[in-house]
Amino acid sequence: MTFRQQLLLTIIDKALIGLLIAVAGFWLNRYLEAFKSRQSLQNELKKVRDQKQIELLEARLSHLYWPVYLHLQMDNVVWERILERKSQNPIKAALAAQIEKDFILPNHEAACQIIKSNIHLADLDPQLIEILLKYVRHVAVYRAIRATGNTETDPLDVGEPWPYDVFPAIEKATLLHQKEFQTLLKQHSQ
């Protein structure tokens, strides 16, 4: 083999190696660009999912959990005063009747209205929905009794006891959703 043939063979060999490296680099670059594009899309989808989750939690908290929780908490603060309806002291009895009429019943009605309007936000928790419906039923019976003019009979007297599990269930759900909301906000802001 002559020098010229060896030189031509070396040039062709180097050109083929260069071409092979260029083709490999081209495909590697395309793969990396596609990978970056997929990663970017996945990150964007995660941001959108997180944002939607934040919006849903915010709606649940602001339209259902916190308002119902606060109405129930207000009931907890004053309900014992209505037990004085049967007091021998006329001032205490009148005060209890007025608290029941002007505060407890409207407060119950407001809580029921919130529940009725926003039950769909109750996170499809069948146990919580059942407890909330017991509360709504209790309030309906309570209102019906008072609408008849009867101020002596309580819902318990007609087989409709107060659902003692309503406040703990709402409190637990509210605090759980609030914690989840704050965690998502913190993660989303980073």
Regions found by a protein language model. Name each.
Residues 1-48:
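Membrane-embedded hydrophobic alpha-helical segments
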Residues 31-190:
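Conserved non-transmembrane functional hotspots
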